Amino acid sequence: MKFSIDPQIFEMFSGISIGVLIINDMINTRNVEEIISLLRHEERKQKEALTGIELGSLPEVSAWREIYRAFGSNPKDFRSSIESLLRRARGGSKPLPDINPLVNLYNYLSLKYHMPIGAEDLAKVSGNIILGFSDGSEEGVALGSDEEETCVFGEVIYKDDEGFLCRRWNWREADRTKIDAATQRAIMVIEKVKEVPEDTFQHALTEAASLIEQHLNARCAIMVMNPQRMSIDL
C-alpha cells in the first residue's frame, strides 16, 4: 500500500508539507484519562486565548481559507478542520465529544499546534491513498451523514480505490475509514502550511508519536512528504 501526493498539489500550494505517522499494533479500546485531560486543558487554554479574536486574523487559519478558495470551495461555506475546531473551542458552550483515544489525541494536538490533523483506519482502506484533485466521480458517505455524496470536480481530496477518504482537503472525513475502538493500524496526517514554523511542525510530530506509543501501546513511524518526497510505502 502506498500514499502518494499529486505533484500539482505542491505546484499550486507552495510551502505545504504533510507529516505522516504510520501507527501499528495500537490498542484503542480503553478509556485513557491522560489524553482526555490534555484535550480538556487545551480546550480551556484556546478558549481563553481566542475570546474576542477574529480567527481569520490568525495566519494559519487565513492560509487555509486562501487554499480553499484556490480549489473552488468558499471558506464561508466550507471551513477547514482547524478553523472549525478552534471555533468550537472559542465558543466553549460544550466540550468536544469523547470519541476514542486516538481521535481525542489528534484533536488535542490540532488545537495545541493550530494544524489540521486527521487519521484513517488502514484496514478499511482499499488500494492506495492519494492526495490530489477530484475528477468528479469519487463517492462516499461522510461522517455524520447517512447519504452518499459525490465529490466536486477539482476539489482537493484524499481518496483510495473505493472513493473519498476526506473531502475538501480536511473539511469532512468519510465514515467508511473512520477510526474506532477496533482500529489497530492507522495513518495520521498533520498538514503544515508555510505560515506554521518548521519547529512547531516537528514538535507536533514528535509529541504525537510519543503520546501514541506511551498511551496506546503502538509503534509509530514518522515521515514528512513534500516536493522531494511525494510517495511513501505504508
Residue ranges and their predicted role:
Residues 1-234:
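Charge-biased, low-complexity intrinsically disordered regions
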